[in-house]
């Protein structure tokens, strides 16, 4: 992923989504096969619909076409992050307390790098998860500096 491109796009997208009372969740710029994709994920407390995605896409496309900061031809995709939205910002982690989350760590904690459970707390430096292992429950502390990525998890 080209970090510079995502930072530039975030700077263009942030005022657009704020003006529409939406939240910028994430920006991805990836090459798949021969094509480049610029994916912008937006959300709000009530969720987002196709009209809101279209409005952000139209405004962002105009702004990016005018300034032309991206070196390759690309496909722009504006969408909701979905039910398993990534947890990236402080606010995301705070809002995830009490919900099911999936966390991948950079290095093993208690011999594991993948965890899925209910987030019991988040204090800015540590996540406390309640894991269910067969019929047992276990609390685990995960330091934020060990978190490679985190997302909400859907359970059935």
Curated annotation (Swiss-Prot):
This protein's GO CC annotations: cytosol
Annotated localization: Cytoplasm
Keywords assigned: Cytoplasm, Ribosome biogenesis
SUPFAM superfamilies the UniProt entry points to: YhbC-like, C-terminal domain, YhbC-like, N-terminal domain
Annotated S-S bridges: none
Entry annotated with the keyword NAD: no
Coiled-coil boundaries: none
GO biological process, alphabetically ordered: ribosomal small subunit assembly; translation
NCBIfam families linked: PRK00092.1-2 (NF000928)
PANTHER family: RIBOSOME MATURATION FACTOR RIMP
Reported function: Required for maturation of 30S ribosomal subunits.
Family: Belongs to the RimP family.
Protein name, entry field: Ribosome maturation factor RimP
């Amino acid at each position: 992923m080209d970090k510079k491109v995502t930072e530039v796009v975030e700077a263009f997208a942030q005022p657009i989504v704020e003006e529409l009372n939406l939240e910028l969740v994430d920006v991805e710029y990836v090459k798949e096969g021969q094509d480049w994709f610029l994916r912008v994920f937006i959300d709000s407390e009530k969720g987002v619909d196709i009209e809101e995605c279209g409005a952000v896409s139209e405004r962002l496309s105009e702004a990016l076409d005018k300034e032309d900061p991206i070196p390759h031809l690309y496909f722009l995709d504006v969408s909701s992050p979905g039910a398993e939205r990534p947890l990236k910002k402080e606010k995301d982690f705070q809002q995830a307390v009490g919900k099911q989350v999936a966390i991948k760590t950079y290095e093993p904690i208690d011999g594991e790098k993948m965890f899925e459970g209910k987030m019991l707390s988040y204090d800015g430096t540590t996540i406390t998860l309640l894991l269910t292992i067969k019929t047992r429950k276990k609390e685990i502390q995960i330091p934020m500096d060990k978190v490679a990525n985190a997302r909400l998890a859907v359970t059935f």
